[in-house]
Design a protein with these regions (language model features):
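N-terminal secretory signal peptides that target proteins for export/translocation
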Residues: 1-2
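A Zn2+-metalloprotease active-site environment signal
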Residues: 5-6, 18-242
Length: 242
């Protein structure tokens, strides 16, 4: 009876946390936005303290100008910081924070490709992917703890089954959602850059360059939190042809 009541409680909590993303996908999000935004703010402040901030006026102006265009229709103000880091990377955090590595600025061929990167990262924020990811992690960890406490598997078979549940939670629940989030951010990013006046077809060139930069060294896609670059390129080509 207790097990049934707990499962009903878990089920009702899951239903109340369901929302819809900007692309129409159902999401599981139950953490308060204020809490997630504070986490993003704290993380960004830490990065600014620990990483060297670029003084290159050209880099800063380019990143700021493109970011401003991408988020022009979004509410609130956005902070953009260029970090001295040779790795080709960029990110956006809850609380409207955007970070761009100098390595990304040297990799892209033009402002449209940089707009594709920033649009993608802003897409993560608009779709509340950080909240979704944190909610998933919390739900899985709490749910597994409750199931373990209720079931109390003592046999070797029971322990093995629970171990498999852990593997399933790792690669069957959490990992795939990350790939879905990345693909969704791609879709949102292309829409943002197109609305801002940039050429969305340049997103294809961007990921071709990213694939060349990776020199073919990628994890197997099934165990990766990001789609393979070749998969991304195919998706962009399909979206840009519509």
């Amino acid at each position: 009876m207790m097990k049934k009541n707990v499962l009903v409680l878990i089920g009702s909590s899951l239903l109340s946390a369901c929302i819809t993303s900007p692309t129409g996908r159902s999401q599981f999000v139950f953490m308060p936005d204020a809490q997630v935004n504070q986490m993003g703010l704290d993380a960004f402040d830490t990065l600014k303290k620990e990483k060297k901030i670029s003084n290159n006026s050209q880099y800063n102006q380019l990143a700021s100008c493109i970011s401003k265009a991408i988020v022009s229709e979004q509410a609130g103000s956005w902070e953009v910081v260029v970090f001295e880091d040779k790795s080709p990377n960029a990110f956006a955090l809850p609380s409207n924070k955007i970070g761009v590595h100098t390595g990304m600025l040297t990799l892209v061929d033009n402002q449209d490709q940089l707009a594709a990167v920033i649009g993608h990262e802003v897409g993560h924020v608009l779709a509340k992917h950080s909240n979704e990811r944190a909610s998933q992690e919390m739900a899985v960890s709490q749910g597994m703890a409750m199931i373990q406490a209720i079931g109390s598997p003592q046999s070797a078979l029971g322990q093995t089954a629970f171990g498999l549940l852990g593997v399933g939670a790792e690669y069957g629940v959490l990992m795939p959602y990350s790939r879905i989030q990345e693909s969704e951010a791609d879709i949102i990013g292309v829409d943002l850059m197109a609305k801002a006046g940039f050429d969305p077809r340049q997103s294809i060139g961007l990921w071709q360059k990213m694939e060349q930069a990776s020199q073919g060294q990628q994890p197997i896609e099934f165990l990766s939190t990001h789609p393979a670059n070749a998969t991304r390129i195919q998706s962009y080509e399909k979206q840009c042809s519509v």
